């Protein structure tokens, strides 16, 4: 014969199981890395395996390809890393390190998974031609010069327009 107490106990267990069912998908979602986080984790692995003296840091990340929603499916990635001033033996994060002037640039391609618990990567990096690094520096410097010139032109236009306004004499 069931008692009222048994009914409350069964109701509590049902409630606990229902809450667990609602919370578990949230825990799984929280363990999925973003595309960039997965690439940064792969770069950490590259730095650990590297025999080079200094750490590498993300220089350029190619746009994220269209992907399925399964975090366990390997996702294609391609990015460029550049040598930093920080020695590989440091405990410092590569993101906190400045790029080394004329540092080695590597082009990396492969796959990463976004599952944080079982995250994996298969990346290979090739030394980029020096021309590529110089080209990147050229574009960066050109952008700075164009920005300065643009500001100067805007200021000259403003000055010209101010001079067009009729002046009233007091």
Curated annotation (Swiss-Prot):
It is found in: Secreted; Vesicle. GO terms for biological process: antimicrobial humoral immune response mediated by antimicrobial peptide; defense response to Gram-negative bacterium; defense response to Gram-positive bacterium; innate immune response; neutrophil activation. InterPro entries: Cathelicidin-like, Cathelicidin_CS, Cathlecidin_C, Cystatin_sf. PROSITE patterns: CATHELICIDINS_1, CATHELICIDINS_2. Residues 150-162 are annotated as: Active core. One of its GO terms (molecular function) is lipopolysaccharide binding. Keywords: Antibiotic, Antimicrobial, Cleavage on pair of basic residues, Disulfide bond, Immunity, Innate immunity, Secreted, Signal. The keyword Membrane does not apply. Residues 1-30 form the signal peptide. Belongs to the cathelicidin family. The cathelin-like domain (CLD), which is the propeptide part, does not seem to exhibit auto-inhibitory function, as it does not inhibit the antibacterial activity of antibacterial peptide LL-37. Antimicrobial protein that is an integral component of the innate immune system. Binds to bacterial lipopolysaccharides (LPS). Acts via neutrophil N-formyl peptide receptors to enhance the release of CXCL2. Postsecretory processing generates multiple cathelicidin antimicrobial peptides with various lengths which act as a topical antimicrobial defense in sweat on skin. The unprocessed precursor form, cathelicidin antimicrobial peptide, inhibits the growth of Gram-negative E.coli and E.aerogenes with efficiencies comparable to that of the mature peptide LL-37 (in vitro). This is Cathelicidin antimicrobial peptide. It comes from Pan troglodytes.
């Amino acid at each position: 014969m069931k008692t009222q107490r048994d009914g409350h106990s069964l109701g509590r267990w049902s409630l606990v199981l229902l809450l667990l069912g609602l919370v578990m998908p949230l825990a799984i979602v929280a363990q999925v890395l973003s595309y960039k986080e997965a690439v940064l984790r792969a770069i950490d692995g590259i730095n650990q395996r590297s025999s080079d003296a200094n750490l590498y840091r993300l220089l350029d990340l190619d746009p994220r390809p269209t992907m399925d929603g399964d975090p366990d499916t390997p996702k294609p990635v391609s990015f460029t890393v550049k040598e930093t001033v920080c020695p590989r033996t440091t405990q410092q994060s590569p993101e906190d390190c400045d790029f080394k002037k004329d540092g080695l640039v590597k082009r990396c391609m492969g796959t990463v998974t976004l599952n944080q618990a079982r995250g994996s990567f298969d990346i290979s990096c090739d030394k980029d031609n020096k021309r590529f690094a110089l080209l990147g520096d050229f574009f960066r410097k050109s952008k700075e010069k164009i920005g300065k010139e643009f500001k100067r032109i805007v200021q000259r236009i403003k000055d010209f327009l101010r001079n067009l306004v009729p002046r009233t004499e007091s």
